[in-house]
Amino acid sequence: MRTRSLLLMAVVALGLAALAAWALVQRGGSAPASTGEALPGFADRIETLERVEVRGAGDGLLVSLMRRGDGWEVEQYPGWPANQREISRALFRLGEARRIEAKTDKPALHARLGVEDVGQAEAKGTELRFEGGGDTLRLVVGRNHPGLGGSYVRVADEDASWLIDADLSPARDPVAWLDRRLVDLPLARTERVRIQPASGRAFSLVRSGEGFVVQGAPAGRSLDAQTTATAALPEQLALDGLAPDDGQEASRRHVYETVDGLRLEVASWQDEAGTWARLSLALDEDVATAWFKQAGEDAEPEAERLQRLRAQVAGWQGRFEGRRFLLPPHKAANLLASRAEHLAPD
């Protein structure tokens, strides 16, 4: 009886072992158990990197970053600064990322995690490619884990895939890697907005106390929310896209005049992509000097303030020259508002 019991236990043990082996295969095979850096050797290479690429399906180049001196430039938009801070953070985040769980090492199952070879026409993931300081490093980034967070990744040319402790998800649009700051003209400095709409007569918004009113409109008729929104357009204005200036004729113009002599012109038009604008900035030094005289004797010397304004104008104008800018819809909507839309009904 004892012999039969031992034999039965042995059979059960063998069966359980076989079942466990089968389950392991179903999970993707015997993935390696070692953990460590998400992309081995990357952290030591960050300072020597010369080029970063984001590639997608069909091995298509989506974004390319080139090191220029101490910073980065988006190759698709030469001459416009990249978002240096965010790029540095992204590189540091990848350098700090660690593998936390081994996943499948079966190429046939890579697509389930989005880490299949991006050379495939239907690939869903992206490949980060790093050049400079040694051999090219390549990391395929797939989906994010729905519960734990973190991305599924695979070092290109290796079969093993991993869940890491960081959400990489590289942006596929080159614009997302740009310094999107276009201009920042504080509302507190603006005293007048001259508007030539697409149709109808020209009108102006002028400062009245803490807000703005439509010049010449009956008292109390101006809609404070709309007049303020239009006057505040250049405050922290960002871009949604940019392109070489193709000479397209503008359908409306807004000229923003500040208390210290700045004159910002926003000439805008629309197409299927949205609202585009051509910007130009000038300085009326007589107005600036007159304003400085009101500042009091403890203020910064006039000559220094004027020189600072000149430098600000030159810097902005240099960025605007030869380019047109796609504006965010919530900002662009204020360029489309007519005179009537700045006024309450009779």
Question: Where are the regions that the model predicts?
Answer:
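A short-motif feature that recognizes glycine-rich, charge-decorated loops
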Residues: 1-346
